[in-house]
Regions:
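Gram-negative bacterial Sec-dependent N-terminal signal peptides
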Residues: 1-19
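Outer membrane beta-barrel
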Residues: 21-35, 43-195, 203-205, 212-216
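Transmembrane beta-strands of outer-membrane beta-barrel proteins
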Residues: 23-31, 65, 69-73, 106, ...
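Extracellular loop and loop/strand-boundary signature of outer-membrane beta-barrel proteins
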Residues: 40-44, 83, 162-163, 195, ...
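Transmembrane beta-barrel outer-membrane domains
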Residues: 46-52, 88-90, 167-171, 200-206, ...
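Structural signature of outer-membrane beta-barrel channels/translocons
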Residues: 58-62, 100-102, 179-184, 212-216, ...
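Detector for outer-membrane/organellar transmembrane beta-barrel domains
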Residues: 207-318, 328-331
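Outer-membrane beta-barrel "beta-signal"
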Residues: 353-369
Length: 369
């Protein structure tokens, strides 16, 4: 349910012309319990198993002649603790204003990147957060760079610390985006993220180019992100100079849906710590029941860390259009040195060197309004 407040005013200078403004309050509350079994056992209550918990405001004003002024202010919530997500930022998920016109849409603020969109539930069975064989498994390249969770590195537009969807290239601060009108199912997008450091316009910035095609059954997208932050004097492993190529697609036929994607990170620093990620999944819907499965692989290159394979099965029961119960069983098979990867940060003690694989069982409920 969306709570909508509408104001309609009469434009006296233009008879029979109306300007309509609407503001909506919306959100998602998603809570789950997890049982993790690796070198040790752990029970968790977490927020955002299927979708990141959030509360937001969005509005639109019809300016006439096909022009609209829009805004979105959306903050993440850790429902298990009552705190704010995304490093404590008030509107850490999205915060932007936009002008939609017959010639395309221009927007500015904190916005999703093409990498975030392609790794989300639009193209993945387990989205890019939370439980299951999530695309958040992919990352840890180039000395710790996280292309899907959000990087803790000194990236051009990241202001928060930590690696849980805080900064670029997942969400891009100080960014401008232009999206073309749709033509024969195609639309293109360009995003620029400014580092906002005087004298370092080309040293602190992010470019994001994408192309998307959509028809009744197929949704496909390709993109390239150039993220660069080489601010003077920072250690090499805390600097960023990477290119990220991503391709994803979702195809629906009857009650079945098949989706997957590919991500390749090119580390342009001398260390050359490249990485690749793959995912392939599908679901089958029967009435209120949804059965899903997905495989995700994370493959760091030029390192001994080793690859991760995640195999996940999931089930969802829709009580209504706004509330569902979900469960999943996932195996994270980790190789190489290090402590391995799961869909989020690995809890201390869950894995140790030589014993890095983890089994996860989750049960949760999601409600949207």
């Amino acid at each position: 349910m969306k709570y909508t407040f509408v104001t309609i005013s009469l434009a006296l200078a233009a008879p029979a012309a109306f300007a309509q403004t609407s503001v909506s309050l919306y959100g998602i509350i998603d809570l789950d319990g997890q049982y993790l079994s690796g070198h040790a056992k752990q029970l968790l209550v977490t927020s955002g198993g299927q979708s990141g918990s959030r509360i937001g405001f969005k509005g639109s004003e019809d300016l006439g002649s096909g022009y609209y002024a829009d805004f979105v202010l959306e903050g993440g919530i850790n429902v298990d603790t009552g705190g704010s997500a995304q490093g404590g930022q008030l509107f850490g998920r999205q915060a932007f204003g936009a002008l939609r016109t017959p010639f395309g849409t221009a927007s500015a603020g904190r916005q999703y990147s093409s990498v975030y969109i392609q790794s989300s539930s639009e193209f993945s069975e387990f989205s890019n957060v939370g439980i299951g064989a999530t695309t958040a498994v992919i990352g840890g390249f180039a000395g710790g760079y996280e292309p899907i969770r959000g990087s803790a590195n000194n990236t051009a537009t990241s202001t928060a610390t930590g690696s849980e969807l805080n900064g670029s290239p997942a969400r891009v601060n100080n960014s401008f985006r232009y999206i073309t009108p749709v033509f024969e199912g195609f639309k293109a997008s360009f995003l620029y993220g400014a580092g906002e450091i005087a004298g370092q316009t080309n040293q602190q910035r992010l470019y994001d180019y994408s192309l998307r095609y959509t028809n009744d059954s197929l949704d496909a997208m390709v993109s390239y992100v150039d993220d660069k932050a080489t601010n003077g004097g920072a250690p090499a492993n805390l600097q960023t100079k990477v290119g990220i190529t991503t391709a994803s697609a979702a195809y629906t036929f009857g009650s079945f849906k098949l989706e997957g994607g590919y991500l390749a990170l090119n580390d342009k620093r001398p260390a050359n710590l490249d990485g690749k990620g793959f995912w392939l999944g599908g679901d089958y819907r029967q009435g209120q029941n949804v059965f899903r499965a997905q495989w995700v692989q994370n493959k760091p290159e030029h390192t001994t860390v080793g690859k991760t394979n995640a195999y996940g099965l999931g089930y969802e029961f829709d009580f209504s259009k706004r509330t569902d119960l979900y469960t999943s069983l996932t195996r994270f098979s980790n190789g190489g040195t290090g402590l391995g990867r799961i869909g989020s940060s690995v809890p201390t003690g869950l894995t140790v060197a030589g014993d890095t694989s983890v089994t996860e069982f989750a049960l949760g409920v999601r409600h949207s309004f």
